[in-house]
A protein has these predicted regions:
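Fe-S-dependent hydro-lyases/dehydratases of central metabolism
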Residues: 1-472
Length: 472
């Protein structure tokens, strides 16, 4: 019987079985940022240990950096100390660090693929829950905690429990105006925020195969919001077209050999899965969240569910969400006023995201009273967007064009909500207080839907605001 990509990668990287049932896995690529690494380096120092394989470890700064004014020292002394600690630790241990102004600084899950560090068949670890993003390339990528960051630094291995594999097919063709962000919100809505517990998600089907790599990254990025620690797509020619020529990818004859090797990681046609579910692409509409979990989502033309329509176990969280968001059961989501619009994060801050929005935003203006930010995912993305005139389109429309970083996705930098502001956001989490204010509200949606909300001043259908649009 054939094997899944997950099984092949696991078996190839398994060093040994541990007594507790876990496996010790070799990690091909370890990505670091400034928030979860200082304590890990401190523990390493206390133990008198060095980084085992510095050449397999790469770092950047993203979570705490201001996106408006990056003049040092930062106004936040804690943020400045985190940056300085990362500079010191990477220099001391001989680790490549993509610092501010290097041309390659950015959100860790944007720069890994962008530089070609992320490759098929790899095991990848990072002290960040959205490490599953890298699975878009056919890698098995884990988000890990600080003590595990220490372990990987010291041994280049990780103790992990083998997961079951669920195949998620999305068949058919996405309708105009429907994007990968809508797909993953739709999947989480139907499978649940805990539906993926104990599973790795393998995404496939004709709609996924038709996606470009940056759309696949969006899909895999939010696997963790659906409870799955790992999400991946089998590598194919789309993967290779994206990777070819990137700085850390093999060149010449080695490139041809790498492609053959990478194709062998694909799940076999007769692979056995622990579960298989299928969705029709045509049934997926532009989707937005209405509550305080990514699973509390509805189509843009939908209404917030009545409590009696929900399974009994979901009602307490729904009641909590309604109270926090200030919504009513049965209320249409379209037309809800917004105060802030945010395009960015490791989910949707790549060049293709910005290109797609600029394509339709040109000639439109942000509604008076709406604060709109666009934060490129990396310095490379920002530079290309400037060169292509994308940044100017955003500026002319009334968006603030910021420097790269995690920005409003989380409350670790100056970009925050105030009071009970409602933010239309292309990020991945809508938890209570996620954007800094204990009363701030987040509604998740695709980047183009965020732009539509910014222009309309309310949650709106991008297909109506901008006219007929094409799927990507």
């Amino acid at each position: 019987m054939g094997k899944t990509l997950y099984e092949k990668v696991w078996e190839a990287h398994e060093v040994r079985r541990l007594r507790n049932g876990q496996s010790q896995l070799f990690i091909d690529l370890h990505l670091l940022h400034e928030v979860t690494s200082p304590q890990a380096f401190g523990m390493l120092k206390d133990l008198g240990l060095k980084v085992r394989y510095p050449h397999r470890t790469f770092a950047t700064v993203d979570h705490i950096v201001p996106t408006h004014d990056r003049t040092e020292p930062f106004q936040d002394p804690l943020a400045q100390s985190m940056l300085e600690a990362l500079r010191h630790n990477t220099q001391e241990h001989g680790i490549t660090f993509f610092d501010l102004g290097s041309g390659n600084q950015g959100i860790v899950h944007v720069i890994g693929p962008q530089l070609g560090l992320t490759q098929p068949g790899m095991t990848i670890a990072c002290g960040d829950s959205h490490t599953s993003t890298h699975g878009a390339f056919g890698a098995v990528a884990f988000g890990i905690g600080t003590s595990q960051v220490r372990d990987v630094l010291a041994t280049q291995t990780l103790a992990a429990q083998k997961l079951k594999v669920r195949r998620i097919n999305v068949e058919g063709k996405l309708a105009p105006g429907v994007y990968a962000k809508d797909v993953i919100l739709h999947l989480i809505r139907h499978l649940g925020v805990k539906g993926g517990l104990g599973y790795a998600y393998e995404y496939g089907g004709s709609a996924v195969e038709a996606m470009d790599m940056e759309s696949r990254m969006t899909l895999c990025n939010m696997s963790i919001e659906g409870g799955a620690r790992v999400g991946y797509v089998n590598p194919d020619e789309t993967t290779f077209r994206y990777l070819e020529g990137r700085p850390y990818v093999p060149k010449g004859a080695e490139w041809e050999e790498a492609k053959k090797r990478w194709l062998a990681w694909r799940s076999d046609p007769d692979a056995s899965y622990d579960d298989v579910v299928t969705f029709r692409a045509e049934e997926i509409a532009p989707t937005v969240t209405w509550g305080i979990t990514p699973g509390q989502a509805i189509p843009i033309d939908g209404r917030i569910p009545l409590l009696e329509e929900l399974p009994e176990e979901e009602r307490p969280v729904a009641e909590e969400a309604l109270a926090y968001m200030g919504f009513q059961p049965g209320q249409p989501i379209k037309g809800v006023p917004i105060q802030v619009a945010f395009i960015g994060s490791c989910t949707n801050a790549r060049l293709s995201d910005l290109r797609e929005v600029a394509r339709y935003l040109k000639g439109h203006r942000v509604k008076k009273g709406v604060r709109a930010l666009v934060v490129p995912g990396s310095e490379w993305v920002a530079k290309r967007a400037e060169e292509e005139g994308i940044a100017e389109i955003f500026r002319e429309a009334g968006f603030e064009w910021r420097n790269p970083g995690c920005s409003m996705c989380l409350a670790m930098n100056p970009d925050r909500l105030e009071g009970d502001e409602l933010c239309a956001s292309s990020s991945n989490r809508n938890y209570k207080g996620r954007m800094g204010s204990p009363r701030g509200r987040t509604v998740l949606m695709s980047p183009l839907m965020v732009a539509a909300a910014a222009v309309a001043g309310e949650i709106a259908d991008a297909r109506e605001v901008f006219g007929v649009v094409g799927a990507r």
